[in-house]
A protein has these predicted regions:
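Conserved acidic carboxylate
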Residues: 7, 78
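Two-component/phosphorelay signaling modules centered on CheY-like receiver
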Residues: 9-29
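Acidic, metal-coordinating helix/loop segments flanking the phosphotransfer/catalytic sites
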Residues: 30-46, 54
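Conserved phosphotransfer microenvironments
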Residues: 50-67
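His-Asp phosphorelay/catalytic-motif detector in bacterial-type signaling
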Residues: 69-75
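As written
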Residues: 87-96
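C-terminal output helix
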Residues: 95, 99-127
Length: 128
């Protein structure tokens, strides 16, 4: 599968890219903005999307566009759980930062049509 990585933090983007490629997938990106992601969306099957990108908190809006326009599976990868509520609609999965390789790999292979899961919430204390 072609996995589009939309993440403005270079180190995190490269980690996601390495995880996807180690699992046998091809990576598209990393991309840092909504505009870049929309330009490459037709080449992807799944999108790993951060909620806060280089062009602002556009990840949730981007995710909805990728689902509606391109029928992509969207997996949010975020350290901002408070931003997930509005953008979760339609997403396949939410993976919390910091993430493990296993969490990301499991999110990528989870079958479409299953209820969205929020990976990483079970072992973290969240403060608002």
């Amino acid at each position: 599968m072609n996995i589009m990585i939309v993440e403005d933090d270079y180190v995190i983007a490269k980690d996601l890219q390495s995880i996807a490629e180690a699992a046998g997938h091809r990576s598209v990106g990393p991309l840092q903005t909504m505009e870049q992601a929309l330009a490459y969306a037709a080449t992807a099957d799944i999108a790993l999307v951060d909620l806060k990108l280089a062009d602002g908190p556009t990840g949730a809006s981007l995710g909805r566009k990728l689902i509606d326009r391109f029928r992509l599976e969207v997996i949010y990868v975020t350290g901002r759980p408070e931003g997930v509520g509005a953008g979760l609609d339609g997403a396949s999965e939410v993976v919390m930062k910091p993430f493990s390789e296993e969490q990301v790999a499991a999110a990528i292979v989870r079958p479409s049509g299953m209820p969205p899961a929020m990976t990483g919430f079970d072992n973290r204390i969240l403060c608002f």
